[in-house]
Every structure is written in structure tokens, then in C-alpha cells.
Amino acid sequence: MEQVMNVQPLTHKDRPALEAMDTGIEDDYVVRIFERLIESDSHELFGLFREGKMLAVGGYSLFGSGKFAMLGRLRSDRRSLMKGNATELLQPIVDQLFRDPMVAWVGANTHLHNHAARRVLEKLSLNQGPVLHFLTLKSPKLLTAHESGPVWEEVTDLQHKKELIHSTEMNELGVFPFECYYPLPYDNALFTDQHLEKSSFYQNPDASRFVIVKSDTKKFDYSHVKYFWNDHYNQPGFFETILHHWKQHPDHVGCWIDFSAEGFKNIPDLSPYDVQEPWMLYGKWK
């Protein structure tokens, strides 16, 4: 007799079922911040259940006043892998999101070499997007072969910030790195006054380049660098500028920088960085 599986949003009563899953993830942050996730207005978490047991968990986060939905936090019980549980969980979630009149885009960010996750996303009809490299600059004394220069001039005027950010819709990253781990389509819905006011903008002397640095927390605190070109090492003062921001925030563990595939190739020496496996962004517009 076939056992019925069902997908349902998680509530406080589901914590024991979540903790009983064998995911192989030590100190899983989803368990650690479970209550925060299920109580949030911008995050949803769902479970795939069979006879009261949770086989998989996953959900989404909303950005840009609900215009963008990023799938994530997918975990499966290792005792029931390769049974299609991830797709079984995510398909109704994606269907629900595309029925939501507020949502215009659904996406997911996964490791380039995570072929199992990529197969799931392709089954969900999400399209491949750019490959991105997330590096954290932690040892600036090891930086070599970059053009030194003065710290770029800070831009504090809100209107000037808007003009700058609207000038780079077509950029070499192919995305807007909204938060650490969360690259999104470059869209005005993300550029609220509040977001821009909390972001530090710096412009180089000939006004041909600018960089945005915003404090962000993903377990640790980072100076999150948003730069839309691939010439990090050729722009005088670029590294002095982002290190200036880090020095103003000594509690940060480093400068998190999103590099395109081409920008990553241009790095002469990776020793100053913590280097993650490359990521691929998937997504689909309505």
C-alpha cells in the first residue's frame, strides 16, 4: 500500500520532527534559528511528511517587497535519499509562489558541483543563470599585484546613490548581490531608500567606477562588497577603499566579495581569501 506524503508549512510543534531528521549537518543553522524563520514575515519553511516523520525540509525567502522568492534551506533525511523527496517538497512550493500575484521571479542558488540539487532545480523548470564566486578577504597583507591608491570618495547623498545604482543595470556580475549568499536580478524593487541609506557608496576619482559596501550577518559579520566590474586589481584604490570600511567595523571577519567567473579568473593569488566552491544562480520570471 502506497504511503501518502504531504507538504505543510512548519510551526513550533514541528521542531521535534526537524531535530529527528538525519541530515548529516552539524550545528545546522536551520535548527538553530528555527523559531525565527517560522515567525518571520519574509521567510517560509515547509516540511515533507510521511506518517508523521519529516523526510525533507525547505522553504523560501522574499525580497523586494515580495517580488523575488529565493528557494533554500533544503535538507533531506539521509535515510531516504534518492527517492525524489526534494522535488516532492519543492514543486508545490514553487507552484504556490507562481500563483502569488506579488511574486515575479523564483530562484535558487546552489553549488555548481552539487549535481543532485541542480537536477531538482531543473525539474522545477528553473533556468541556469550566472556562475558566481563568493570570496572573503581575510588576510589583506597577502594581497599582491593590485593597483594601490587613495581611498575613494564616499557618496552620502541619497539621490546620487540612486543615480549610481541605476547606471549599472547591465553589469559584469549579471546580478545584484543583495546579501551574502543572495544574488538577485538587478531590479529597482531592491533599491529602497532604507537599503541605500544603510549602504556605503564610494566613487573613484574619475567617476568611472563605484563600489558599495554594506554590513551583513550570515553567522558572522561581514563587510559585503558589491562591485559590478571585473577589474578589481586594476582600479587604483579599490582594495584600500573596502579595507577602509572593514577598519571602521573591526567586529567584521572580513570583506565578502562576489566575483563573476571572469573576475575570479583575474585574481592573481587566492591566498588572501577564504574561497568557497563556485555557485550557480537559477531562476525564472513569470
Task: List the predicted regions and their residue ranges.
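Active-site rim helix/loop that mediates acceptor-substrate recognition in acyltransferases
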Residues: T23-E51, G59, M170-F201
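Non-catalytic interaction/regulatory modules that flank or connect domains
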Residues: G149-Y233
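Conserved acetyl-CoA-binding loop-helix of GNAT-fold acetyltransferases
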Residues: S76, M82-L97, R119, N234-W246
